[in-house]
Amino acid sequence: MSPLKQFEIFPLIRLPEFFGWDINFTNSSLYMVLTVVFASLFLFAGVFRGKVIPGPMQSFVEIVCSFVLGIIKGSCGKAGSDYFPLILSVFLYVLFANLVGMLPLPMSFTVTSHIVVTLALAMVVFIFVTLIGLKKQGMGFFAMFLPDGTPNWIAPLMIFLEVCTYLFRPISLAIRLTANMIAGHTILKVIAGFVYPTSLLISPLSFLFVVVLIVFEVFIAMLQAYIFVMLTCVYLNDSLFKH
């Protein structure tokens, strides 16, 4: 089986077209729902019957929340704390989307392996931080496109380059996540495929290598969620403060 077959989208429930749009419930739709369900259950497990002396699950959820809050404060200071709910939601969605795709479930699918999903998420972040910048700084927000001390003769070129760089942010954010998920899952699938045809002597070593690779892929999944949120906070910092 092709290692790229795991990225194919196919309908699970066929629905009538909506003004010419295909709105079938696909394997991608299923795993998006599962991602939200798992992320919601994770948070619910942390707050359900919360105690002054937290149990293991409550402690773990609090550690994750504190970790995300630390990223926000490290990039944006206390002013960024107001946006903690959204940043936490983005972090958990990316994290669980990456991890759920690695579970041995039927029709296992990683939604973040498709650029349309990551680009949509990146556009939400991009529009959000842009609106925050316009609200906080007003017309002064556009000053970020012309660095202080820029000579007048080169100002038009600098503005053009800065605007292009700003508009490219969601694209780079989406491509980075998608490329890493595709590469990691493809390599894992290819190497795992070598375990079956190898001899009994080599198979245990191959299996051990696959286990190590899975652990590494889990690390990459968590790292990509961290990078996505870190860059989101960096962009938020640009919108909150004049530079």
From Swiss-Prot:
**Subcellular location field:** Cell inner membrane
SS bond list: none
Cite the entry's keywords alphabetically.
Answer: ATP synthesis, Cell inner membrane, Cell membrane, CF(0), Hydrogen ion transport, Ion transport, Membrane, Transmembrane, Transmembrane helix, Transport
Q: Where are the transmembrane segments?
A: 28-48, 52-72, 83-103, 114-134, 141-161, 177-197, 200-220, 221-241
Q: Name one GO molecular function term.
A: proton-transporting ATP synthase activity, rotational mechanism
- Membrane topology recorded in Swiss-Prot or TrEMBL: Multi-pass membrane protein
* GO CC annotations on file: plasma membrane; proton-transporting ATP synthase complex
Give the domain of life. Bacteria
Q: Which Pfam families match?
A: ATP-synt_A (PF00119)
What PANTHER family does the record point to?
A: ATP SYNTHASE SUBUNIT A
* Protein family (similarity comment): Belongs to the ATPase A chain family.
| Quaternary structure (record) | F-type ATPases have 2 components, CF(1) - the catalytic core - and CF(0) - the membrane proton channel. CF(1) has five subunits: alpha(3), beta(3), gamma(1), delta(1), epsilon(1). CF(0) has three main subunits: a(1), b(2) and c(9-12). The alpha and beta chains form an alternating ring which encloses part of the gamma chain. CF(1) is attached to CF(0) by a central stalk formed by the gamma and epsilon chains, while a peripheral stalk is formed by the delta and b chains.
| UniProt function note | Key component of the proton channel; it plays a direct role in the translocation of protons across the membrane.
Supply the name of the protein.
Answer: ATP synthase subunit a
> What is the species listed in this Swiss-Prot or TrEMBL entry?
Neorickettsia sennetsu (strain ATCC VR-367 / Miyayama) (Ehrlichia sennetsu)
Q: Which gene encodes it?
A: atpB
